[in-house]
A protein has these predicted regions:
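Transmembrane alpha-helix termini and helix-breaking/packing motifs in multi-pass membrane transporters
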Residues: 1, 62, 66, 175-192
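C-terminal membrane-cytosol helix-exit motif in multi-pass small-molecule transporters
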Residues: 1-19, 203-211
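Short amphipathic helix-loop junctions that connect adjacent transmembrane helices
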Residues: 58-75
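Helix-to-loop junctions at the C-terminal end of transmembrane segments
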Residues: 88-101, 185
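Structural signature of the two symmetry-related core transmembrane helices
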Residues: 104-119
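Intracellular juxtamembrane helix-capping segments at the cytosolic ends
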Residues: 141-154
């Protein structure tokens, strides 16, 4: 699939003929300064949400298979439920967001991230876990909208560098969660899951209070 993606990119993505004329040295410091206050608020909330995502993510399969007797085949079904749910909601939600404001859709996505660890903790059967994985799929609900909002909030003359710097900073900081996740799990699944939910709630509240809403041009 990776090879197919490379071939498609080579044939169908056209290079800007003026790209060479626009090239200039890009400094990380300048890119960081391109993060506007509104974009910084989105970044802070997004980092907290990624903590909520990363803390339990390595232990979801352990929780389902080892702790609750789910078979590997059943877990494969659960994973498929999550993936299909995400696929089904992304495009309709993105269309709705283009016709209105983006903040409600991003905020709803953050709520799903915060709720998933709690729902997962109380899901002890295959049927209950099916519901939990529907919720996991709904975490993709507003992802295209959030990415569009990043570009909307980035400076007009530095959108690409601001976008890349946003993800660099987010992923570096969010990777810290991986170091503490195992320690939290060893304290107990509930400690791990509810700590993740607390970070998710903090990110959701922060964005609800400080996140900027934008009306679509259409």
């Amino acid at each position: 699939m990776g090879a197919v993606a490379i071939v498609l990119e080579a044939f169908f993505i056209k290079e800007d003929p003026d790209a060479g004329k626009k090239d200039r040295a890009v400094r990380l410091r300048d890119s960081i300064h391109s993060i506007t206050p509104d974009l910084r608020n989105l970044l802070i909330s997004d980092v907290l949400i990624r903590f909520a995502e990363q803390i339990p993510t390595a232990f979801v399969v352990i929780w389902a298979v080892d702790r609750n007797g789910i078979t590997p085949l059943q877990f494969g079904i659960l994973a498929t439920i999550g993936i299909v749910t995400g696929m089904l909601v992304q495009i309709p939600v993105a269309i709705l967001a283009d016709r209105s404001t983006k903040k409600p859709f991003v905020l709803t996505t953050f709520v799903f991230f915060a709720a998933f660890p709690i729902v997962l903790y109380f899901s002890r059967s295959f049927s209950a876990l099916c519901g939990a994985f529907v919720l996991r799929g709904l975490q993709e609900y507003g992802e295209p909208t959030r990415k569009a909002l990043i570009l909307d909030l980035a400076p007009e003359n530095a959108k690409a560098s601001a976008f890349g710097t946003y993800y660099l900073l987010r992923d570096i900081i969010a990777s810290i969660a991986a170091f503490g996740a195992a320690w939290l799990w060893n304290r107990g699944p509930g400690v791990n899951f509810f700590t993740a939910a607390a970070f998710g709630a903090a990110g959701t509240i922060y964005f609800a209070v400080f996140g900027r809403d934008l009306k679509s041009a259409s």
